[in-house]
């Protein structure tokens, strides 16, 4: 995609016109012809200042051109993207930029501030974000607002400004789009665009996420030399840690416990003296516990799972399963009861995979459960749900159950 810098005034006109839901004819009536406004917005015409002022006035735009203000804001925006690449805290710099929101929207930095805002708030699905800015917008908007509405509105505006973006801006726009879509193939297309535009470890991490989601684990393994070299050249410990964690997780998904342990140990050692340990600790111990459970290293599995502090559904599932295998009926019943309670919550409504995972464990409490035709039916429904709702790692953990039911089905066929 060939991208070049556009006239900032044209970008402002176009962005604000779109935001207000106005057509070109409505904006330029009595000032200039539609074709001239179109050229201004596309950056293909150098606008007459007298006409530009009239167009700005019609849209209520106070165009920000103060050099000191723009220089300071540019530095803060660059700091935000630097922090994003190196895994550093961004709330402080976001608050500084959010305080200048209205002025930055009407400045040559309009695309950048929208990108910063949607990147920041698209992270709300996995971590806490500052909502005071959104709350302040709610007071201004008659119909109210929330994070999702904010994201939808600004991503829609950015989509209209794609041809005004340079390579890096388009890469960051692609990053947001990858976070907002649920389709794996579409995600991968966006991830590839991120890497094409950034050509750094942040882009490579996006590619790795795509490979992980599509269970292309070999592709993650093959990236090791290239990724480690890039991370060392950047001096980026966070990226290096993230690669080792993802590579270890890829091995965990196929129960390769020895290779998983190698990469998770590298992750732990790199993190042990940093502030990032808490970010990775729980996922690391959960994955290790689940993998040790799958390969029959039960005591090590119990040790790892006991280090996970939150009692969410998946942790309770692994603990209940583990205690059933260890013959600890009372402990298994305890975690099954928690799972049943969690399934009654509103946020679990419609999660068929979780419901069937619970039912499968309940059936495992019965003697000779694999010989029960009802268990075969349950496993078939569970596998369909996992394929539809979960990643390959979830499916792989039931490989032994599939073998049991396959043998049982063969026995039933021979009896018939």
Where do the protein language model's features map onto the residues?
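A short, Lys/Arg-rich alpha-helix, primarily the initiator
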Residues: 1-19
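The alpha-helix within a helix-turn-helix
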Residues: 17, 28, 56
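Short alpha-helical DNA-recognition segment
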Residues: 20-39
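DNA major-groove recognition helix of helix-turn-helix/homeodomain DNA-binding modules
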Residues: 48-66
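TPR-adjacent "capping" and linker segments in tetratricopeptide-repeat scaffold/adaptor proteins
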Residues: 65-74
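Helix-turn-helix/homeodomain-like alpha-helical modules used for DNA recognition
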Residues: 74-124
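Extended amphipathic alpha-helical coiled-coil/heptad-repeat regions
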Residues: 132-382, 391-395, 399-402
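Conserved small/polar residues in nucleotide/adenosyl-binding loops
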Residues: 404-413
